Amino acid sequence: DSVMPFINHTPNEKGVYVLNRTSNPGGKDLQNLQVTDNEKRFPLYMEVARGIVNYNAGSGSVGAVVGATNIAELKDIAAFYADKSIPLLIPGVGSQGGTATEVLSVLRSVGYPVELARVNSSSSLTHPWKKAPVPEDWLERCEANLRSMIEDTKV
């Protein structure tokens, strides 16, 4: 009843992304809670991943949001999805600390089809000077970060 209304009202050739494991530090408070299934213990985010696979099986239009800031968790989730055609939206690259190079390396290492991944790096592209005053060369910095991101994510 929380995801299906979105899936049911998604037009053809469109999709929805479900939060699987977020990149914010507080995400671990809930998403890393241990759940048990047939005496096996695993983090809640892996149970969410199983749910995403089930939702996608019915519609083919469900992806997962998995942050780039905890590379070990991204690796576990990507390995689980590697043969299931689940698109990944991966925020947390750039200002939050993840790198596109590391993300793509991890995806490739577990056999995840990188063409299904969308690596997001908005803050480091739109205002790479962090919280400092806007520099005179702000446009050049934005362009340089964009070029770097494109280079880092070439398939």
Question: How should these model regions be labeled?
Answer:
Residues 1-65:
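Conserved anion-binding
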Residues 3-7, 49, 74-75, 100, ...:
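Generic structural signal for well-ordered alpha-helices
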Residues 7-11, 53-56, 77-82, 150, ...:
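Surface-exposed amphipathic alpha-helices with a cationic face
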Residues 10-14, 35-40, 83-86, 107-110, ...:
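Short, low-complexity, polar/charged sequence segments that are solvent-exposed and flexible
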Residues 29-31, 76, 131:
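Short acidic, glycine/serine/threonine-rich loops at helix termini
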Residues 39-46, 71, 97, 136-143, ...:
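Electropositive phosphate-/nucleotide-binding environments in soluble metabolic enzymes
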Residues 69-120, 124, 128:
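A C-terminal functional module that forms or caps the active site or interfaces directly
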Residues 103-112, 116, 125-155:
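C-terminal helical cap(s) of enzyme catalytic domains, especially alpha/beta-barrels
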